[in-house]
C-alpha cells in the first residue's frame, strides 16, 4: 500500500512524525516537499522517503493531511483511493461532488469513545488550540498577566473570560491560571460548572429573560 502525506498549508503541523517511520516500509511512503519546511524536525529522517508530486500522486492508495485539503491537491488520485484527515465542511462537499469515486475518512466525525481514543486527533488539536490561544492573547494585551509587585506599586492580575468549555476551553482555563490570571469560564451548559471550578476558575451563570 502506497501512502502519501500532504503538507500543512499553514506550515506548523505535519501528518507524519519521525517516530512513526519505524512502523512502516519507507519505500511505500511519499511526502510533499514542503511538509517539514517550518517544523523543527530532523530532515535526515525523511531523506529516504519518496517525493509526493503530480506523477506519484496517481499511484497513491491513501493520502493523509492535517490542516486543509482542496480538490486541486488530490485531483490526480486513482479511483477507489482514500483521503484521511480533518476535513473542512465546504471542501469535503466539493470533493465528494467532483470525485465521488474516492473514499473520505474525516477525523472530525470520529466518535469520542474509549475504543477510538488513540485516534482522537480532534481532541488533541483542540487541546493545543486552547493552549496556544491564551499564549497569543497574552502577547496582544498591554498589561502583564500575573500579579506583580514593583517599585511603582502593585499590578493586578489580568482578567480572562473563556467562552465555551470544551476541550479547548478547559485547556485555555488551565493555561491562563498557570500564567497567573484571574479566570472566568462561561458555557450554555450549566453542568460544566464543576469542571470550570475544578481548575480554579469561576463559572459565569447567565439567566435568560424574555420580553413579550
Model-identified regions with their sequence ranges:
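Glycine/serine-rich phosphate-binding loop and adjoining beta1-alpha1 elements at the start
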Residues: 2, 72-157
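An N-terminal-biased, well-structured beta-alpha scaffold segment characteristic
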Residues: 2-101
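Glycine-rich phosphate/diphosphate-binding loop of Rossmann-like nucleotide-binding domains
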Residues: 7-41, 146-212
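N-terminal start-of-chain detector that recognizes signal peptides
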Residues: 40, 55-57, 132-136, 155, ...
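Short, hinge-like loop/turn segments at secondary-structure boundaries
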Residues: 46-50, 121-125, 201-205
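Residue-level detector of short coil/turn "hinge" positions at structural boundaries
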Residues: 48-53, 104, 183, 203
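A short acidic, often aromatic-flanked loop/helix-cap motif at beta-alpha or helix-coil junctions
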Residues: 55-59, 110-115, 209-212
Amino acid at each position: 500500500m502506497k501512502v502519501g502525506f500532504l503538507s500543512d498549508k499553514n506550515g506548523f503541523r505535519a501528518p507524519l512524525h519521525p517516530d512513526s517511520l519505524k512502523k512502516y516500509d519507507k519505500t511505500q511512503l511519499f511526502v510533499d516537499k514542503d511538509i517539514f519546511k517550518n517544523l523543527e524536525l530532523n530532515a535526515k529522517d525523511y531523506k529516504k522517503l519518496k517525493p509526493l508530486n503530480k506523477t506519484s500522486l496517481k499511484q497513491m492508495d491513501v493520502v493523509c493531511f492535517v490542516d486543509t485539503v482542496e480538490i486541486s491537491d488530490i485531483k490526480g488520485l486513482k479511483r477507489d483511493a482514500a483521503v484521511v484527515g480533518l476535513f473542512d465542511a465546504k471542501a469535503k462537499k466539493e470533493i465528494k461532488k467532483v470525485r465521488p469515486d474516492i473514499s473520505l475518512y474525516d477525523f472530525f466525525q470520529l466518535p469520542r469513545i474509549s475504543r477510538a481514543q488513540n485516534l482522537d486527533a480532534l481532541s488533541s488539536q483542540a487541546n493545543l488550540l486552547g493552549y496556544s490561544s491564551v499564549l497569543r492573547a497574552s502577547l496582544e494585551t498591554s498589561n502583564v498577566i500575573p500579579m506583580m509587585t514593583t517599585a511603582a506599586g502593585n499590578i493586578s492580575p489580568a482578567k480572562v473570560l473563556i467562552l465555551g468549555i470544551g476541550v479547548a476551553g478547559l485547556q485555555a482555563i488551565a493555561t491562563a491560571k498557570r500564567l497567573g490570571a484571574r479566570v472566568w469560564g462561561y458555557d450554555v451548559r450549566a453542568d460544566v460548572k464543576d469542571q470550570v471550578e475544578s481548575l480554579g476558575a469561576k463559572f459565569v451563570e447567565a439567566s435568560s429573560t424574555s420580553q413579550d
